[in-house]
Amino acid sequence: MEKFTVVNSVAAPLKIINVDTDMIIPKQYLKTIKRTGLGKGLFSEQRYKEDGSENPDFVLNKPAYRNAQILVAGDNFGCGSSREHAPWALADFGIRCVISTSFGDIFYNNSFKNGLLPIRVTHEQLDKLFEDAERGANATLTIDLEKQEIRGPDGGVINFEIDPFRKHCLLNGLDDIGLTMQKKPSIDSFEAREKVARPWL
């Protein structure tokens, strides 16, 4: 998993509340268990017209936001069914951080496991971030995980909370497999002892 330390990027404003996981990645893209390639399906029903061409009015299709690594979204982002494909699709598209006032619980937990940082802010802070994001290429946000800060284009700072363990995992690029591999010497030692103590196993 890629480490998350500091991200400096324009932020795409998605002023929609209750964005559910089916909107993030529709069901037809759930046949795969690969984490790569899902970026093309991200918000596909909003990004594309019926003929398959791009919808120029959707925020992620606008030139200023095509390479955005930060998404500023309305309340209750990631609600709905529990599909890990949602953070996979966001990450594959290039999104590293989603900022909202609230998140669906399962999406919130899955995000950390896949290198995606979900940040909760107040409604007042979200309104300010939407204002910054709508300036497009003329304004970038900086997400500093170590300092737990969102720095705006005009020097303003918003502090955010994060569980210390989740922060450690993101800073060090540790997913569940990475955490297990940290314990490999202890696991190997245990298995060696068990082979001697219980050779029939």
Swiss-Prot record:
Taxonomic source organism: Afipia carboxidovorans (strain ATCC 49405 / DSM 1227 / KCTC 32145 / OM5)
TM regions (residue ranges): none
SUPFAM superfamilies the UniProt entry points to: LeuD/IlvD-like
Keywords attached to this entry: Amino-acid biosynthesis, Branched-chain amino acid biosynthesis, Leucine biosynthesis, Lyase
HAMAP family, per the entry: LeuD_type1 (MF_01031)
Entry GO MF terms: 3-isopropylmalate dehydratase activity
Record text on subunit structure and interactions: Heterodimer of LeuC and LeuD.
Entries under Pfam families matching the protein: Aconitase_C (PF00694)
Family label: Belongs to the LeuD family. LeuD type 1 subfamily.
Reactions the enzyme catalyzes: (2R,3S)-3-isopropylmalate = (2S)-2-isopropylmalate
Purpose: Catalyzes the isomerization between 2-isopropylmalate and 3-isopropylmalate, via the formation of 2-isopropylmaleate.
Keyword Amino-acid biosynthesis recorded: yes
Top EC category: lyase
Gene Ontology CC terms: 3-isopropylmalate dehydratase complex
The name this protein goes by in its record: 3-isopropylmalate dehydratase small subunit
Pathway entry: Amino-acid biosynthesis; L-leucine biosynthesis; L-leucine from 3-methyl-2-oxobutanoate: step 2/4
E.C. number: 4.2.1.33
GO terms under biological process: L-leucine biosynthetic process
PANTHER family: 3-ISOPROPYLMALATE DEHYDRATASE SMALL SUBUNIT, 3-ISOPROPYLMALATE DEHYDRATASE SMALL SUBUNIT 2-RELATED-RELATED
